[in-house]
């Protein structure tokens, strides 16, 4: 089979690899139909996730068809159409008992990390209908909801700022609207992404720059926001969240940070501020699937480009230069070469 392999810092290539086999009785082999490229894949290429070794097949999101199952698997059978959860869980360890599936002693974030991932024709590892929308439930939409909206304690009537209008920030935007905040402010350096935020429901779109804090304070009558969601993973955006947060507020970090950031305790120590960090645990995936199928969330709105798997390196180049290409989520299709390089 073909797979996209991490061969060195900022280097990937398509290689021929053996088709995966059932190893444990709980395993399933999935023939991929679609996968996507995540911001965390770019962090891996830059060396920001050092536990990922050279030689690893990339990817942790996907949708496909069950090819084979182990002897203990009873809920799925060959031929079933399924989505692949980013996180796997044993259901028995102390972390699973607490719902912290991302830290499962025998699972967690394994695909494209500690085991070969989903950017291949087959992978070793939920029932799902518009597949470009449903593939978003593998990782992106639950990350926005769990790590941003729920950790950030978004609630009716609160004021929310989302710093970063990329796929994860826009996912948080769509989830936040389910909780009826009074204000949602989107901040980004890219006017095109801010316009995407407006289309998807942001009440205000603020261009990041020297006057961004002043504008947010004007919108919030000088109070700041109750929830600041950091959806980039950089020192300037974490700094901005600290400037936007109001008394008693929560800064919810989603972004993957490849380096240190400054924490201004001299300004925050007496303001009852909460800062949260977490990994995706996928407990919201089932709820999001129902919302997608009911049309309450438009996951397909985030898919801007589609490539056939044979052109996945071009897909990476497109996603890495997202601003220049007006790219949000890039779909990689294994089944339909007729959609090659389409702009959705």
Set out the residue ranges of the language-model regions:
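Glycine-rich cofactor phosphate-binding loops and adjacent beta1-alpha1 units
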Residues: 150-156, 195-274, 313, 339-340
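Rossmann-fold dehydrogenase core element
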Residues: 250-252, 262-302
